[in-house]
């Protein structure tokens, strides 16, 4: 029992270290993008908290895999302390950890973040008393609470039974997975709500992460245009616009007023001139900065990172394609959510992770790296595209200039994407997520000189769907991902969409030229007040 406590303590100690790193990262990440001029304490704290909770929930995945793997020895036998009661206790600890974090996520998505968002919307429109702003924010937030309540009610009573097919052992195995997860209505309701949010996270991942996986590495490889060259072009544009304004105004030298068409043209040209002069100030700042010289010095390193990221992106895409193809060919079909027990078509990541787990904690490091890679590529996609509602761009995400409302949107999108990350990792490495590095004993007859003898030996074999139920422990993560077969079917088709969007984004990113050295920092719809936050940290 002492050994069990030691193993459990080791896993949770590493989780604690990951928690500390996540809190530091979330604080730096939010502070990096928030507007210094419009910074608000409550929105900053909310954004940091929401992002940290999402990352912490993703950090539970490797802890779950670590604990089920360390219950068994490499020879396929259970460790002395890992009896049935202890194993169930450890599994339940991880499961309760998931439900605690997921309950907090529901609180953030359906109550806290909407309330803070609407509060600041009201604060901008009405400078009246705080009580009135809080009441209005609560009124709008009530709609989100209603949606949450509906999801919980549906989840509590939605049927979990998968359609019955006779004479199929695969169907029987899939059904056992659903039965093992339990039938508590409260936990089922929570699972349904989280799965619904994960579907939204899947859509966000298809939109932003898939594009960011191609845009981020190619931008690193191509680099940015020269600040001096851009400034020269900008100066020429300023002179051209000034001359056009003078030509139009020269029409009224004899006292005649300008026509309405000419007045509109002058107004548009003057707005264009203001934008160009703002660009001039930004380019002058960046051209004189030491940061530009530093970026030029590390240019070879950025190219190396870009090549590495594009290789990783292609590796992920190939692994995801092979995993989805395996489901299409060997799963029980649509009615089971394309659930597959074991792997028939292996992929690079599914082969690599069990090997790394033998040298603890390399697999933990790789999983953390994968999660962070998804976060960075998602952020790259959001920053390049902005936050859109259909064809309307709501907010732009810019370093040091992001409004409080946009920051809340950003963290909610990242929170939903990270929720979907667990299924993405399962899609990339299904065998690893299901069993980790567990092995079980298989009986084998020993032969001597080609003659079978009555000597029975046992050899260790990697856990798969053919293993006896009492010999291999399925992770709580895997069971949680497949609690509702219809969500699994949605995730399956979402993976194909993810691959398609990545390939389209790769083509678009290849066709685009170099980015401006001040890309996204100066737009025509910006106010001149935004220049109060001039920054040299563009590259």
Swiss-Prot record:
InterPro entries given in the database record:
LMBD1_LysCbl_Transport, LMBR1-like_membr_prot
| Primary residence | endoplasmic reticulum
Where in the cell? Endoplasmic reticulum membrane; Lysosome membrane; Cell membrane
**What are the annotated glycosylation sites?**
75, 85, 167, 344, 445, 454
Any Pfam family hit: LMBR1
Per the record, what is one GO cellular component?
A: plasma membrane
Q: Which residues lie on this side of the membrane: Cytoplasmic?
A: 29-47, 119-141, 207-302, 383-405, 505-539
What topology does the record note for this protein and the membrane? Multi-pass membrane protein
What are this entry's molecular-function GO terms?
Answer: cobalamin binding
Q: Which residues lie on this side of the membrane: Extracellular?
A: 1-7, 69-97, 163-185, 324-361, 427-483
**Protein family (similarity comment):** Belongs to the LIMR family. LMBRD1 subfamily.
Matching entries from PANTHER family are given as:
LYSOSOMAL COBALAMIN TRANSPORT ESCORT PROTEIN LMBD1, LYSOSOMAL COBALAMIN TRANSPORTER-RELATED
Q: What does this protein do?
A: Lysosomal membrane chaperone required to export cobalamin (vitamin B12) from the lysosome to the cytosol, allowing its conversion to cofactors. Targets ABCD4 transporter from the endoplasmic reticulum to the lysosome. Then forms a complex with lysosomal ABCD4 and cytoplasmic MMACHC to transport cobalamin across the lysosomal membrane. May play a role in mediating and regulating the internalization of the insulin receptor.
Q: What is this protein called?
A: Lysosomal cobalamin transport escort protein LMBD1
Q: Gene name?
A: LMBRD1
